């Protein structure tokens, strides 16, 4: 009886530890930075998404074998996906974000976008829903500004637009 008990405990531990590496690849966190570049007078938007999460999102969207590290097509597909999941509004109009590029650095895919700086009187609102349709516990952080004046907005599944308050 004791042997059977320890056998079950060992089996349960083996199953638990086997699941940990699979879960470790899913970080469920995307970080975006939105700041004004005074040299170019453009709003720069940078998204950092863990590679495994980005590839999982592409598989979820129907891409059979995504390979973000070595496939420009996979990187472009994820960049297209990001543009649909990160809308920006200026007043009541959707802003046109320009895709600048993407690259793999470390364990993340970085996607770069930009747009013109809105007038100071205009309200800028953001809604980051990157990966929220893939994982219910996804959290997206949007850092606004730069230097020592950074403000962070946190988005989860189902959240609406939040005012960004960009400052020159």
Regions found by a protein language model. Name each.
Residues 1-6:
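N-terminal secretory signal peptides that target proteins for export/translocation
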Residues 8-19:
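Bacterial N-terminal signal peptides
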Residues 24-168:
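N-terminal soluble domains immediately following signal/targeting peptides that reside
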């Amino acid at each position: 009886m004791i042997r059977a008990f320890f056998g079950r405990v060992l089996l349960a531990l083996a199953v638990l530890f086997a699941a940990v590496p699979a879960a470790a690849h899913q970080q469920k966190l995307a970080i975006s930075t939105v700041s004004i570049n005074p040299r170019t007078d453009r709003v720069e938007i940078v998204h950092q998404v863990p590679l495994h999460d980005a590839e999982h999102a592409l598989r979820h969207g129907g891409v059979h074998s995504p390979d973000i590290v070595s496939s420009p097509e996979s990187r472009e597909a994820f960049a297209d996906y990001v543009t649909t999941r990160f809308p920006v509004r200026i007043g009541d109009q959707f802003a046109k974000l320009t895709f600048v590029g993407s690259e793999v650095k470390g364990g993340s895919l970085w996607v770069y976008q930009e747009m013109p700086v809105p007038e100071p009187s205009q309200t800028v609102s953001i809604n980051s829903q990157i990966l929220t349709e893939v994982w219910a516990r996804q959290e997206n952080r949007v850092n606004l500004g730069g230097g020592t004046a950074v403000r962070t907005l946190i988005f989860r599944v189902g959240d609406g637009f939040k005012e960004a308050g960009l400052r020159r």
